[in-house]
From Swiss-Prot:
It comes from the Bacteria. This is 4-hydroxybenzoate octaprenyltransferase. InterPro entries: HB_polyprenyltransferase-like, Prenyltransferase, UbiA_prenyltransferase, UbiA_prenylTrfase_CS, UbiA_sf. PROSITE patterns: UBIA (PS00943). CDD domains: PT_UbiA_COQ2. Belongs to the UbiA prenyltransferase family. PANTHER family: 4-HYDROXYBENZOATE POLYPRENYLTRANSFERASE, MITOCHONDRIAL, PRENYLTRANSFERASES. The chain crosses the membrane at residues 23-43, 46-66, 99-119, 141-161, 163-183, 213-233, 234-254, 268-288. Keywords: Cell inner membrane, Cell membrane, Magnesium, Membrane, Transferase, Transmembrane, Transmembrane helix, Ubiquinone biosynthesis. Its cofactor is Mg(2+). GO terms for biological process: ubiquinone biosynthetic process. Catalyzes the prenylation of para-hydroxybenzoate (PHB) with an all-trans polyprenyl group. Mediates the second step in the final reaction sequence of ubiquinone-8 (UQ-8) biosynthesis, which is the condensation of the polyisoprenoid side chain with PHB, generating the first membrane-bound Q intermediate 3-octaprenyl-4-hydroxybenzoate.
Length: 290
């Protein structure tokens, strides 16, 4: 019986950290890899790469824990989230706080192996991860904060490699914010009706009938900024082909969200994993001269 209870608790932690749903970690991973490949260029040190990949998974898990902790009073009223570990009672509030601290401490220990500039930037990363879940109560722009949180690994990656944050770094950071607002608005479109009822704010609610148009504008902005980064860094044909493929994926997403159906909007959100992957492959091909 003791083992059964322990096993159930571990499974609840597993669900709380979303390790059963890797999409969030992947959307955080791709911009991190973009930054490491541009900063190095193309040949990141193995230890730095390992630290950032591990950090992505750990901090994404920590972000999910604090997000569910912040939303624990609301999730029970939303059909999609009612069975999450905190509202269902599978994990207590005290356990969630302890798990968050453990994940953050492990992440910080990894960062301590890097240079001072990266360590200082990591403090801002923690602040963004903590603040984001609470923003949806006070502003319709929590997706902007999410974009900053998901993109903060970009200046950290540049700092870890060269102890500098050049123009390409900040253009990539801005591109990631636009991309995050676009894909998280698609995600928020799934819960829009429930969010209106319980008073949760989002860009999906703010944009209203113009949601598809604004998502499209942001997607074009992502492609334009990534093209500028390619020009600044002298990237090759493989990279620009990847931008074209990413553009085709964005067109496909627009087709999916055309009627604002929940399942289709969620499918569009999930499709962004391929956008990140394609752009990374383009960078790899450019630097490796395939």
């Amino acid at each position: 019986m003791e083992w059964s209870l322990t096993q159930n608790k571990l499974l609840a932690f597993h669900r709380l950290m979303r390790t059963d749903k890797p999409i969030g970690a992947l959307l955080l991973l791709w911009p991190t890899l973009w930054a490491l490949w541009v900063a190095t260029p193309g040949v990141p040190q193995l230890w730095i790469l390992a630290v950032f990949v591990a950090g992505v998974w750990l901090m994404r898990a920590a972000g999910c824990v604090v997000n569910d902790y912040a939303d624990r009073k609301f999730d029970g009223h939303v059909k999609r989230t009612a069975n999450r570990p905190l509202p269902s009672g599978a994990v207590t509030e005290k356990e969630a706080r302890a798990l968050f601290v453990v994940l953050v401490l492990i992440s910080f220990l990894l960062v301590l192996t890097l240079n001072t500039m990266t360590i200082l930037l990591s403090i801002a990363a923690l602040a963004l991860a903590w603040v984001y879940p609470f923003m949806k109560r006070y502003t319709h722009l929590p997706q902007v904060v999410l974009g900053a949180a998901f993109g903060w690994s970009i200046p950290m990656a540049f700092a870890a490699v060269s102890e500098s944050v050049p123009l390409s770094c900040w253009l990539m950071f801005l591109a990631n914010i636009l991309w995050a607002v676009a894909y998280d608005t698609q995600y928020a479109m799934v819960d829009r009706d429930d969010d209106v009822k319980i008073g949760i704010k989002s860009t999906a609610i703010l944009f209203g009938q113009y949601d598809k148009l604004i998502i499209g504008i942001f997607q074009i902005g992502v492609l334009a900024l990534m093209a500028i980064i390619g020009e600044l860094n002298g990237l090759g044909w493989g990279y620009y082909w990847s931008i074209l493929v990413a553009g085709a994926l964005f067109v496909y997403q627009q087709k999916l969200i055309a009627n604002r159906e929940r399942e289709a909007c969620f499918k569009a959100f999930m499709n962004n994993n391929y956008v990140g992957l394609v752009l990374f492959l383009g960078l790899a091909m450019s630097y490796w001269h395939f």
